Amino acid sequence: MRTISIKSPSRLQAPNGAQLTTVAATVAMLLATSLSTPKAQAAESTESEELATVVVTGSRIVRRDFESSTPVVTVGKELLEQTPDFAIETKLRALPQFAASGASQFNANPATGGTGAATLNLRAIGDNRNLVLLDGRRLMPSTSNFAIDVNTIPASLIENVETLTGGASAVYGSDAISGVVNFKTRTNFSGIRFDVQHGSTFKNDMPNTDATLTLGANFAEDRGNAVFAVNWSDRGTIRQRDREFYRRAWATSYPASPVTIIQGAYNPTIGNNLPTEAAVDAYFATFGAPATAVSRTTSLGFNNDGTLFNATGAVGTNIYNFTSGVPLRQAVSTTATGGKVVSEYSFVGQELAVPVTRTSLFTKLNYKLNEYADVYLQAYNTHYDSLAESGPIQLGNFWAITVPRDAAHPVPAPLATILNTRANPNADWVLFKTTLYTGQRITEGRSDVSQIVGGVRGTLGLSDWTYDANVSSGRSQLVTTGVGGYVKNALAETLFDAPNYGANYRDSNGTCTSGVSPFGTFTPSQDCIDYMTVNPKNRTELKQHTAELNLQGGLFDLPAGDVRAAVGASWRKNTYLFRPDDALTIARSSNQDTDFSGTFVT
């Protein structure tokens, strides 16, 4: 079978100048017109080659005319190889049909995919609303929402990528609402090929190295072909502080909240036990604040000398008595007049790109049994290690610390004066604080994705009817381990609740020598940090089993061409299992999770 190309007048221009062919309704109309004149077509048959039959993504019908009711964009291997970025999802995002996805190389949040996975988001509907196929068959899902990690696809064997931009749920099922992306691999490869690439960004960081060895050979008098490929890839990282536009963004636009203040802050709005406005006015009047300039609902930050400052206002003009020496910046707020302030700290140390090391094995075998049957087998396994880093834990909102109001928990005199004006002066008060001293959250990810597909295809011997029957089995497992910065809130609460804020505290979980003072930029002793931090390990496992049978062929002829039909049946079973670490199943733990498992059959 030869590859043919029919170009429509409409083309998409790629960044490097390559033209991407689209097959649209206008082409279908022209071809339908030509089919209505069989005599003219016959007269020209001696001068033109016969068109090869192909299957266009979006229909299971084999045909010669490339008709499609919705646009199909085909990206060839030349464009994929010439695009300087190594990531497949980044190469395809050069097309307007693709939007940014939740899981990509530029996502360092382990809660949203920052573990090395890369998914596709067709038409910005969601990465689990488009179907990703390999040679027309389903791939093994890799994420909790059953999206496909395209890192598992052997890039060196990709011949082209077909993108159907219209909904295809009638043909492929409900997971093809936004369209279909079909990766087609090379056929009948014979020989040895070694590819190696190395590159970096324009700032000479985030180094990338990719090496692939491909072996292929024909056998049994060319009735069969076997291909084996091994790929190794290593990608470095970029931190957000390495880019000026990120540093500016953190300096002006991070959502304002007292939870980001590393000095700690008293939040009076939780618990419906506000101090009086008169007490707040009297305190801040000594620093030149007009009456009601600081509302009694304002969170009050703690200076290192025990005095208070307000966390609402414009930096340099309406922030009163800030003396801690920790840089403040203003964050734009649409809900507070004058804006809010937050502490400058190591958000910019967060990764912009996740470092990943990946190893992939892929094999493909085809063998022609007879004129009616070809058997095929395809299998792959991809393993990758990643290291995602995000900001320190914030003790606030749902994870806020409730501090007892008693003699065993002394507070600075200015705070005591304000707390004593509450309707219930002896009630607990609420602390918001970022635990900068516990460090950045660092998550190691280890993932394995494997799948095996086997089937038989051929002709039925009835006119031109063909069949394709296959089964597949796959498994995906992701293990993430927190190796730094994760706080078990229940243990942090234990220290803050203990007399003298946990100074010289000891129980079965460990010791705390210095205690964990809520006030100022106090850094506790290492044993206190060890007491409240954990190294959680979570396991996510997905399994998929499928069976599919498809038949297609011609029914009868009409003046405009033959009428063809396709009929098929499919069965699919998916199972999902999530087992979080015991430390994260306890109420109010940071990154809290619960066990979950389920199965669905379609």
Q: What is each stretch, according to the model?
A:
Residues 123, 164, 184, 195, ...:
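Transmembrane beta-barrel domains of outer membrane proteins
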Residues 70-119, 137-150, 163-169:
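Periplasmic N-terminal accessory/gating domains of Gram-negative outer-membrane beta-barrel systems
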Residues 162, 189-217, 228, 344-353:
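Short strand-turn segments of transmembrane beta-barrel domains in outer membranes
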Residues 139, 152-197, 239:
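A beta-strand signature from Gram-negative outer-membrane beta-barrel systems
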Residues 197, 222-278, 341-348, 390:
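Periplasmic-side early beta-strands and strand-to-turn transitions of outer-membrane beta-barrels
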Residues 1-96, 123, 212, 216-217, ...:
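N-terminal Sec signal peptide and the immediately downstream disordered periplasmic leader
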Residues 80, 92, 161-162, 181-183, ...:
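Non-catalytic regulatory/gating segments with a bias toward low-complexity or hydrophobic composition
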Residues 144, 238, 244-253, 308-357, ...:
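Surface-exposed, low-complexity loop segments enriched in small/polar and acidic residues
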